[in-house]
UniProtKB/Swiss-Prot annotation:
GO molecular function: peptidyl-prolyl cis-trans isomerase activity; protein folding chaperone; ribosome binding
UniProt KW keywords: Cell cycle, Cell division, Chaperone, Cytoplasm, Isomerase, Rotamase
Cysteine pairs bridged by disulfides in the record: none
Domain observations: Consists of 3 domains; the N-terminus binds the ribosome, the middle domain has PPIase activity, while the C-terminus has intrinsic chaperone activity on its own.
PPIase FKBP-type domain location: 169-264
Organism of origin: Trichormus variabilis (strain ATCC 29413 / PCC 7937) (Anabaena variabilis)
Encoding gene, per UniProt annotation: tig
Cellular component GO terms held in the UniProt record: cytoplasm
Name the record gives this protein: Trigger factor
Length: 471
């Protein structure tokens, strides 16, 4: 079999394949023989159908098409093997199948073209001496006080209050019923449109403005138990229920009771109730250590992201469609798994109509991820960076001990750990051979917001789903 190769865009190899007359005839005859054994033709037993009857009944074009399918499949497979091509994904026929049917004659040579994806060639123009900026996240001691105060709020005892009006910080017990406020030009005599789910009895609302839709809490402040009044409010935009987003509303509110919070003292007893520590001092120290490490980890992550972003700029690679599609598949699978773990019906979110949009909008991120991965692999190859079996086993043992009750696929865990350790080593090497300038938190975010990449449809679905479950 004669095979001619050519290099095509997107890391493809084009193949011109010429199949010998002997093979085209032999395959055609074999197809006729196989069909005669399987086709039911009245008046003839299977395997005893005369050749001419079979040709008349099925038609020569049908038989040629069946033979051609075998010739193409076998021809491509043999060509890849003959030329020692490390193909990835499924080969693609470049010639028109209809044209091939018309030109194919058993006993004559058959020439057609196909293409296969191969691993891309990576040109890493620069990977040492990279320069980038990353935001430094500094530990804020005030976070410890904020966490402790939040715990106090959650452990607060509600004490009924009499003889005064409701004020910010109280907990109000109310009955309410809401309607959509009429806009200018609406029929004044029409019945107000009730808000779906916009009524409740004995509803406890904490009088903090961020605890309800804007205007609702402000309207309750100043009311006395027993008072009923109309409170104007407005649904935010965006809002979980898009039909209500941005619409003004009127709530008829009856204040039934006022309660105020009695907070526990911040002492050792409090520390023992909310944690495993015996003293408040020990709890504070633990929280401080946690948030210091969190700040350090975030700073390191920012450095890594800045480094990888800079590395990608110096990678020249023509990605094959097979790798991009595979990466998109992985991204959507990860998104589906996360949503499923949240208890959401993935089938309702990932409809047949939206999946093509998801795939298309996920491509830019898939390409970015592939470039990062291939870039790191190339650095490891050039600098002979590797992980040892001992390093892998140590990390695996550590993880298994952390989750003694989990049913762990140890072989798969080995693979995951090996990849993670290798990535860590490569990134550490790159950091040591690059300059990442740390800048104040927020200074880069403002610049990036001016050039914001559109979020993927999968991210949109996740945000919407999280908002729905959070209400």
């Amino acid at each position: 079999m004669k095979v001619t190769q050519e290099k095509l865009p997107a890391s493809q190899i084009g193949l011109e394949i010429e199949i010998t007359p002997e093979i085209t005839q032999k395959t055609y005859e074999q197809v006729i023989k196989n069909l005669s054994r399987t086709v039911n033709i009245p008046g003839f037993r299977k395997g005893k159908v005369p050749r001419q009857v079979l040709l008349q009944r099925l038609g020569k074009t049908h038989i040629k098409a069946a033979a051609l399918e075998e010739l193409l499949q076998d021809g491509i497979e043999q060509a890849i093997k003959q030329e020692s091509i490390a193909a990835i994904g499924q080969p693609r026929l470049r010639s028109s199948f209809d044209d091939l049917i018309n030109s194919y004659e058993p006993g004559q040579p058959l020439t057609f073209t196909a293409a296969v994806d191969v691993e891309p060639e990576i040109n890493l123009v620069q990977y040492t001496g990279l320069e980038a900026k990353a935001e430094e996240i500094k530990y804020d001691p005030a976070r410890v006080d904020e966490v402790l105060e939040k715990e106090r709020q959650e452990l607060a005892t509600l004490i009924p209050v009499e003889g005064r009006a409701a004020q910010i910080g109280d907990v109000a017990v109310v009955d309410f019923k809401g309607v959509i406020a009429k806009a200018e030009g609406d029929d004044e005599n029409a019945e107000p449109e009730p808000i779906p789910g916009g009524d409740a009895s004995d509803f406890q609302v904490e009088l903090q403005e961020d605890k309800f839709i804007p205007g609702f809490v402000t309207g309750i402040v100043g009311m006395n138990p027993g008072d009923t009044k109309e409170v104007s409010a407005q649904f935010p935009d965006p809002y979980v229920n898009q039909e209500l987003a941005g619409k003004p509303a009127i709530f008829t509110v009856t204040l039934k009771e006022i309660k105020e919070k009695e907070l526990p003292e911040l002492n050792d007893d409090f520390a023992q109730e909310v944690s495993d520590f015996d003293t408040l001092e020990a709890l504070r120290a633990s929280l401080a250590e946690r948030y210091q490490k969190e700040a350090e980890d975030k700073t390191k992550n920012n450095q890594q992201e800045a480094l990888l972003g800079e590395l990608v700029k110096h990678i020249e690679v023509d990605l094959p469609e097979t790798l991009i599609e595979k990466e998109v598949d992985a991204m959507l699978t990860q998104t589906a798994m996360r949503l499923s773990q949240q208890g959401l019906d993935v089938k309702k979110l990932f409809t047949q109509d939206i999946i093509p949009q998801l795939r298309e909008r996920s491509r830019p991120e898939a390409v970015e991820r592939l470039k990062r991965s291939l870039g790191l692999q190339e650095v490891a190859k050039r600098e002979s960076i590797a992980v040892t079996p001992e390093e892998i086993q140590a990390r695996v043992t550590e993880l298994v001990q952390q989750y003694p009750d989990e049913d762990i696929d140890v072989e798969r865990l080995h693979t995951i750990v090996e990849n993670e350790l290798l990535s860590e080593k490569i990134i550490d090497w790159l950091l040591a051979n690059s300059t990442i300038e740390l800048v104040p938190e927020g200074s880069l975010a403002s610049q990036e917001s001016e050039i914001t990449a559109p979020e993927t449809e999968a991210e949109t679905i996740e945000v919407t789903a999280e908002s729905t479950t959070g209400e």
